[in-house]
A protein has these predicted regions:
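C-terminal cap/substrate-recognition subdomain and adjoining C-terminal extension
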Residues: 2-162
């Protein structure tokens, strides 16, 4: 039921460095999206909490306050993730060659191959082999350095946060 979803939300923790990662990218003018095979009840909150521009995930069907066990179409699967990435890039007027995609599982492979730069973040071996770069530490802000973002820019974004 919805109460179980609330309990799950309160037990959710972000990857270390998530706030620094999103804050720095926003400060530098990046547009940020979540394209997840997870659930909108979580990604919508993460979007608001971290100031992310787009969030797409699977919607759980809830009838009379109870989960039905079904998903509402469209289902965010491997192929749909790539389609969403293309749609977001078009909406933001960003060429796919300038898009960075980060993933960890096989369901991310089509999306990763669509982007100009693809990064495995603690990814499965198949994802690491397909990626342009791989980050194998648990800190999401480590991705900033893969993107060539300077320490000074990270510190400036953090300094601007009260």
């Amino acid at each position: 039921d919805e109460a179980a979803v609330e309990r799950a939300w309160h037990n959710l923790t972000y990857s270390p460095g998530a706030r620094t990662f999103t804050r720095t990218l926003r400060r530098l003018g990046y547009r940020i999206a979540i394209v997840s095979g997870g659930f909108t009840v979580f990604t919508d909150r993460i979007k608001r909490d971290l100031g992310i521009h787009h969030a797409h995930a699977n919607e759980l069907e809830i009838v009379d306050g109870r989960l039905t066990g079904e998903l509402v179409d469209p289902i965010v699967n491997r192929s749909y993730k790539a389609k969403l990435l293309e749609q977001i890039a078009e909406a933001e007027d960003v060429p796919l060659s300038q898009v960075v995609a980060v993933g960890d599982g096989a369901n991310d492979l089509d999306m990763l191959s669509t982007a100009g730069l693809c990064i495995a973040f603690n990814g499965k071996p198949i994802v690491e082999r397909a990626a342009d770069a791989a980050v194998t530490v648990p800190y999401l802000d480590a991705l900033l350095f893969v993107l060539g973002i300077r320490r000074e820019d990270v510190e400036a974004a953090d300094a601007g946060h009260v």
